[in-house]
């Protein structure tokens, strides 16, 4: 298929003409303003809501990892303090990763980001179509040879974090074992030191990527699906979020400020659909998995069967990284993500090769048809 569709023109404008779109940057705002103009032109009423965000998740986790390493070192001189510090690091990590209590992010310097909310009608929506406009920063942890093992590395780091206070507690209750346990505790501490190096390297040496697949492709699908739904004058919100890559700040702000309106809405999130095996998620979550709405997964399966190339759409569990869908999902709202994967991760994920030339327009067109079919099925219920 020739790369000439209106969907592909959105990808080109966002990823090539605007280029990298860091969280809270002018380029991110330009992308949102472009989307606003596109949606207004087909009859949507729009609103830009602002909020504060960090520019990256890396420094938050860097601080947490340092707290845990300090806890391991304290085991040599003051074990009770090591236990307290180690447990505190675990709680901070869980709070940050689940977004339920991101205490560390609150102390990181902030920028202003925005969400774009577009509505066809007043009142509560039945459907929310979402995609994030910002793009990410590269780093060695996202090198193509390492990215496929990202979740494994994440779990090793988490359990290393957990191991430090556990070992310190054992030292407290069994002092005779202190000497060998202190050396054993150095193993998780070294694992976390490597994690700290990766996080710092990303911030100090990484580059902001163009984000053609992640996530100009998803925004393109949202805009084109919105255009196709415009004539229905239906209770649909199209939400283009900011600051997803920093820690889901945009979607978090949307849910916090509009929960009453969104409590009965279906969420269809679109992320990284520009290359790879197109999938609909059945479970998401990095630390613990939450099943996506069975109603939406069945709907995605049935709607995919109506597509000419339906065999190219598969169910999947996506546990590699949290995306915007995590925010409504953890709050019990019916949610699903459409995403394309290769070896279990998005293609060219957070890497400089995430450019327009590496996006497959056929993937995008298939996703548009799937979103349109799902929305009309929900509206006709």
Q: What are the residue ranges of the model-derived segments?
A:
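Extracytoplasmic/secreted proteins, especially bacterial periplasmic and envelope-associated proteins
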Residues: 6-9, 13, 30, 34, ...
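Short glycine/serine- and small hydrophobic-enriched flexible loop segments
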Residues: 16, 223-230, 373-377
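N-terminal capping segment at the start of a domain
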Residues: 1-27, 42, 201-208, 266, ...
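Short beta-strand element of the alpha/beta-hydrolase
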Residues: 126-131
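A non-catalytic alpha/beta surface segment that caps or lines the substrate-entry region
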Residues: 21-121, 141-179, 183
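Active-site-adjacent substrate-binding region
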Residues: 20, 50, 276-381
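Soluble non-cytosolic domains of exported or imported proteins
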Residues: 4-8, 22-30, 216, 220, ...
């Amino acid at each position: 298929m020739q790369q000439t569709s209106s969907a592909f023109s959105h990808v080109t404008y966002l990823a090539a003409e605007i280029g990298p779109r860091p969280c809270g940057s002018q380029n991110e705002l330009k992308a949102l303003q472009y989307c606003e103009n596109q949606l207004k032109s087909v009859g949507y009423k729009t609103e830009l809501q602002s909020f504060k965000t960090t520019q990256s998740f890396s420094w938050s986790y860097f601080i947490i990892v340092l707290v845990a390493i300090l806890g391991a070192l304290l085991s040599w001189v003051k074990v009770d303090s090591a236990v307290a510090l180690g447990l505190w690091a675990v709680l901070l990590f869980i709070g940050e990763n689940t977004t339920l209590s991101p205490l560390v992010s609150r102390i990181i310097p902030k920028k202003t980001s925005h969400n774009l909310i577009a509505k066809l009608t007043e009142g509560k929506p039945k459907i929310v179509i979402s995609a994030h406009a910002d793009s990410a920063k590269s780093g060695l942890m996202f090198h193509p040879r390492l990215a496929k093992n990202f979740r494994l590395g994440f779990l090793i780091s988490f359990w290393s974090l957990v191991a430090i206070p556990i070992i310190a507690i054992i030292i407290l209750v069994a002092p005779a074992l202190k000497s060998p346990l202190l050396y054993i505790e150095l193993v998780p501490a070294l694992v976390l030191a490597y994690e700290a190096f990766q996080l710092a390297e990303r911030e100090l040496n990484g580059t902001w990527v163009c984000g053609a697949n992640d996530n100009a492709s998803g925004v393109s699908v949202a805009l084109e699906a919105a255009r196709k739904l415009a004539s229905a004058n239906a209770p649909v919100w199209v939400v283009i979020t900011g600051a997803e890559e920093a820690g889901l700040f945009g979607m978090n702000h949307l849910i916090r400020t509009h929960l009453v309106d969104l409590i009965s809405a279906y969420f269809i999130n679109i992320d990284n659909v520009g290359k790879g095996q197109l999938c609909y998620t059945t479970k998401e979550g990095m630390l613990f998995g939450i099943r996506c709405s069975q109603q939406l997964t069945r709907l995605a399966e049935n709607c995919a069967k109506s597509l000419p190339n339906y065999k190219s759409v598969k169910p999947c569990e996506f546990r590699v990284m949290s995306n915007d869908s995590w925010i409504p999902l953890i709050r019990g709202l019916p949610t699903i993500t459409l995403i394309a994967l290769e070896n279990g991760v998005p293609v060219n994920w957070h890497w400089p090769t995430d450019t327009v030339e590496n996006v497959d327009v056929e993937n995008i067109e298939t996703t548009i048809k799937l979103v349109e079919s799902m929305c009309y099925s929900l509206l006709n219920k």
